[in-house]
UniProtKB/Swiss-Prot annotation:
This is Response regulator protein GraR. Residues 2-115 form the Response regulatory domain. Phosphorylated by GraS. Transmembrane segments: none annotated. Keywords: Activator, Antibiotic resistance, Cytoplasm, DNA-binding, Phosphoprotein, Repressor, Transcription, Transcription regulation, Two-component regulatory system, Virulence. The modification 4-aspartylphosphate is found at residue 51. It is found in: Cytoplasm. The keyword Repressor applies. Pfam families: Response_reg (PF00072), Trans_reg_C (PF00486). InterPro entries: CheY-like_superfamily, OmpR/PhoB-type_DNA-bd, Sig_transdc_resp-reg_C-effctor, Sig_transdc_resp-reg_receiver, WalR-like, WH-like_DNA-bd_sf.
Length: 224
């Protein structure tokens, strides 16, 4: 697995690089933190590990840049004890977030889970779902309604797929969290809310934001 590790703390970078390579990850680092996108495009990584606090521009800036061209999984690292950093990372389309210090075994487990979810899922035959008058392409993470197309993150698509498969039924928040993350203890309840709100915002671009209903205290429901 090719990993781009965007971390300016060289001691931590070397520790993580050594551990990741022990697990057969191929790790590329950054020398020039004003050229993160150049390195990203050269290496075409399968997963990006991104520190929040970086020289030149912060990790959120680079996440925005990457999301303009790719849905590659992004996992944020941060030493700041600020819940809004986690909220911001989810709003920008990151796949996971870890606060320093952390155990490397947990990082490895998260990376392996992300890889299975994104690439083994993506390797399946093309699958589509018809939802109302829209075509949901699970292999491309896209929704087409008429001539309009929107693209979702992997997390948003997993949420939408679960809701569509149980149309007019309530899917509980716990069910969604369990499906999205292997260990729900590492996920705040607010993280799911952020992802659903971001999904609704994208659906609003094709006039479908009202088709996902919040059931207060329970979960969410997609209408037929």
């Amino acid at each position: 697995m090719q990993v781009l590790l965007v971390e300016d703390d060289q001691t931590l970078f070397q520790e993580l690089k050594k551990e990741l390579e022990h697990w057969d990850f191929f790790v590329t680092g950054i020398d020039d933190f004003s050229a993160v996108m150049d390195i990203y495009e050269e290496t075409n990584p399968e997963i990006v590990i991104m520190d929040v606090q970086l020289p030149k521009y912060d990790g959120f800036y680079w996440c925005r840049k990457i999301r303009q061209v790719s849905n590659v999984p992004i996992l944020f690292l941060s030493s700041r004890d600020n819940p809004m950093d986690q909220v911001m990372s989810m709003e920008l389309g990151a796949d996971d977030y870890m606060q320093k210090p952390f155990h490397t075994n947990v990082l490895i487990a998260k990376l392996q889970a992300i890889y299975r979810r994104v690439y083994e899922f993506g390797a399946e035959e093309k699958r589509t779902l018809n939802w109302q008058d829209a075509l949901v392409d699970l292999s491309k993470d896209s929704i087409q309604k008429g001539d309009s197309v929107i693209y979702l993150s992997k997390t948003e698509m997993i949420i939408l797929e679960m809701l569509i498969q149980k149309q007019n039924q309530i899917v509980t928040r716990d069910t969604l969290i369990t499906a999205l993350w292997d260990d729900e203890a590492f996920v705040s309840d607010n993280t799911l809310t952020v992802n659903v709100n971001r999904l609704r915002k994208k659906l609003s671009d094709i006039g479908m934001d009202t088709q996902i209903e919040t059931k207060v205290g329970k979960g969410y429901m997609a209408h037929e």
